[in-house]
Amino acid sequence: MTAPETLFESSLSSLRLKARGKVRDIYEAGDDLMLIVTTDRLSAFDVILPDPIPGKGRVLTRVSRFWFERLKDRVPNHLSGTPLEAVLPDPAEREQVEGRAMVVKRLRPLPVEAVVRGYLIGSGWKDYQRSGAVCGIGLPSGLRLAERLPDALFTPSTKAEMGSHDENIGFDQVVGLIGRELAERMREVALGLYREAAAYALDRGIIIADTKFEFGVDEAGVLHWIDEALTPDSSRFWPADGYRPGISPPSFDKQFVRDYLETLEWDKKPPAPHLPPDILARTAEKYREAERRLTGE
């Protein structure tokens, strides 16, 4: 048997399914472990699209593993080191998720998205145009679209249910949710991870404009980096060679899909329309190109 080229939804009868997210299927794998399967599902405008992107889940898994390993000295992460066969002894089930599964520690997720912005783009640009600030953090006047910020900003948000939008919150609200010590640690770690990763990526021709981290804690209250790590899904990657402030750069992600969907008369509610083969292929290649540049593989 060979692993399937695309996987829209996993089916592992030997493990209890805990949750299906927009992209990931999460299974319980004993008292202290979970299995995260990254599928090829793609969401746009908070709606899951009906067509998988070939190989996307494997790219996201390899990129996450790369960053978890590279930045492990900054903060513990959720990787358990347990081999896949230890939780999936059935070869057929293992084959189904090979290359797209991670056996991780069971941790308590924190109810905050740790967003770090290094460039003025997206909702941050709209906020700045309106108020001269991003998420309440004042910035110098005269900054242009996509301009590098004087320093990276920690702009946390709530974790919304699937189908809803995250909402930006102030640091005091983070303190109210998880306590001051943990909030300050999260901010320090998120900014440190971003700065180191952004410098590394820039040397390889990629600008990390912004990214989203998720964290959890173990029973001792120790902060861990969980979920995914600096992937094209959780981050805005731009090619450095074409970067010019004042112009919105192309992204190494699902921009082809978003641009195509904007040409349709679709109300951005389920069910989503099917995607043409060329859009699927071009999107898959963008994900692979980001991986090649970052990891050299």
From Swiss-Prot:
EC primary class: ligase
Recorded catalytic activity of this chain's protein: 5-amino-1-(5-phospho-D-ribosyl)imidazole-4-carboxylate + L-aspartate + ATP = (2S)-2-[5-amino-1-(5-phospho-beta-D-ribosyl)imidazole-4-carboxamido]succinate + ADP + phosphate + 2 H(+)
Top-level taxon of origin: Bacteria
UniProt keyword terms in alphabetical order: ATP-binding, Ligase, Nucleotide-binding, Purine biosynthesis
GO molecular function: ATP binding; phosphoribosylaminoimidazolesuccinocarboxamide synthase activity
GO cellular component: cytoplasm
Record EC number: 6.3.2.6
Pathway the protein contributes to: Purine metabolism; IMP biosynthesis via de novo pathway; 5-amino-1-(5-phospho-D-ribosyl)imidazole-4-carboxamide from 5-amino-1-(5-phospho-D-ribosyl)imidazole-4-carboxylate: step 1/2
GO terms classed as biological process: 'de novo' IMP biosynthetic process
Family note: Belongs to the SAICAR synthetase family.
NCBIfam families per the UniProt record, alphabetical: PRK13961.1, purC
Protein name: Phosphoribosylaminoimidazole-succinocarboxamide synthase
Organism: Methylococcus capsulatus (strain ATCC 33009 / NCIMB 11132 / Bath)
Gene: purC
